[in-house]
Amino acid sequence: MRKFTLLMLLLIVISMSGIAGAAEVKNLNTSKTFTKIQEAIDDPSTTDGNIIIVGPGNYTENILVNKSLTLKSNGSAIINAVSSEKSTITIKANNVWIEGFIIIGGKNGIYMENVTGCTITNNTIQNAFVSGWEYYGGNGICLVNSTNNTITNNIIRNNTWNGINVCESKGNIIKNNTIMYSGGIGIYVWGFNKFEGNNIIENNRIINATYGGIYLFRPSNNKICRNYIANVSSGGGGMSGAICIDVSDYNIVKDNIGINCDGGLFTDGMIGNEITNNIFKNCKVAVSESTYGPASRNNKIYGNYFINYETAISDPKGELVDNIWNTTEGGNYWSNYTGNNTGDGTGNIPYYYDNKPLVVDLAIEDIAAKPSGIEVRVKNLGKADIKKIDPLTKLKIKISCDNDVYETFIDPLSAGESQIVRWDKIVPEGNHTIKAEIPYSAEGYLIGTNIRDADISNNVFSKIVQGFVQNKTFTITLTNLGKSTITIKYYISIYTNPVNGTKVSYRELTITLKPNETKTIELGKYPFKYAVSGTMIVKNPSRYRIPLNLRIKYEIEGLNPQMREISKYIAPRGEFRYIARYTGKEEGYADVW
């Protein structure tokens, strides 16, 4: 009985394990289900255009897709190659769609040969392995003689050789992929002979590759745009860079970023390429030309930013001279360049082959005293964009006036961009000298940065300005100190000065104050030397005399107020009339008379 019970428990456990680990593959068009992906593909009723949904689970198989199918998973289907001699997925049909898988191992993660119109999207592809060098092995994705395919939004990592290997394939779109830890190259486009590529490679992130970020070997007319490449080493061979163009012609290489690589731009025998608006930062060698192949010539290389390099240009044979390094507007930015601004935003002496190096030239353009404070206009007169050099840097600005000093920081400025620095110091009436400066080191570097200012003569600017008569708030506050309610008629005029000024305002007010009640009359904002003239009338309508106990406070914003108190009786059916004027004094108080 005990043995029978144990046997039943074992069968239940095995049954439950099978249910928990079961994976379902379903053809949505035929409604058939399978336990293997290859079974679903090979089924005779599976035809071109069918959609196969692969449920969560582990699938240990090498898959051959030889029909125009869509294979989709929600990101939880893991395909492990059963044989490392074959690719995990091999595509031999056109118009195949692969989406949402975790693809592990195999000779390649995905291998595509002689196909067109396929889409590989939203997959994680990792650990493709070969033990030695192979043309078509050890890659996350490998395309051979394939056209017009789309590879997007994949994570490709830890492969023996290349993240994406594109051999003699044309018109493909490779974008928005993240490629990490490639033993070879991040994206390698190559051929045994020169060929028309017309591939688009854009918005990819390539991190930690051994022999190059994006490497073009013999294809032409490709677009390499807006890619981010970091941490590319040379693998000991010396022929490496964030972007490598090797015997490859008429490509557009634009708006890419290469950071922390052994090389920024590697060239060899390239012709007619446009290499513009790229940023190469913290690379040991900014630009290097191979010593093995033919000379690179007739390439446009300008508008690029080469920042914090050890060697600007490595060109032992002088083969990079026959290229276009600048237009009439300017060339490239070189962080180690020490020339000065010629007045047009470029350097006054060439830098290697670049005759018009882009420079930074911060200048104090103007100083103004405004009613709200001091304004200083700072402008980058250079043609180098500081936002590209260091988007996180802060530029120090120092302003002084009347022994007061104000220091602040502004964000980086693009070429030709201005920024207003505001200091809320109110400049009083009269002449005052305001000095503004952009601090720099003895070598001409902007303080707190690694950015050299190419013209320090305009970093300091002094100007004598006329201060403003500041408008102040005038108020009168009335407090009834007596025990009876009183009514006050108040006639108030405001003049431009207390002697013979022009009347600028007139008001008639009726104010009722209960015992111990306080009310404030706000007269408006005027220069503190304006004068307020007020006539106050309090009437007694009764047959008896009444006491009047009133406190009056005269105030001008920022000055010491003055108080007056009235304590007297008003005759029966009589009235009390009180006339007073007040103005502001330079000494800082309100004067009442």
Swiss-Prot record:
Q: Which cysteines are joined by disulfide bonds?
A: none
Keywords on record: Cell wall, Cell wall biogenesis/degradation, Glycoprotein, S-layer, Secreted, Signal
Residues bearing attached sugar chains per UniProt: 29, 58, 66, 74, 114, 122, 145, 148, 158, 176, 208, 231, 326, 336, 340, 431, 471, 500, 516
Task: List the Gene3D superfamilies hit by this protein, alphabetically.
Answer: Single-stranded right-handed beta-helix, Pectin lyase-like (2.160.20.10)
- GO BP field: cell wall organization
Give any Gene Ontology cellular component.
extracellular region
Query: Its domain of life?
Result: Archaea
Pfam families the record matches: NosD
The signal peptide, as residue positions, is 1-22
- Transmembrane helix among the record's keywords? no
Post-translational modification as stated in the protein's UniProt record:
N-glycosylated; contains glycans composed of methyl-Man, Man and GalNAc residues in a molar ratio of 2:3:1.
Q: State the NCBIfam families in the record.
A: para_beta_helix
Q: What does this protein do?
A: The S-layer is a paracrystalline mono-layered assembly of proteins which coat the surface of the cell.
Protein's recorded name: Cell surface glycoprotein
Question: What organism does the UniProt record list as the source?
Answer: Methanothermus fervidus (strain ATCC 43054 / DSM 2088 / JCM 10308 / V24 S)
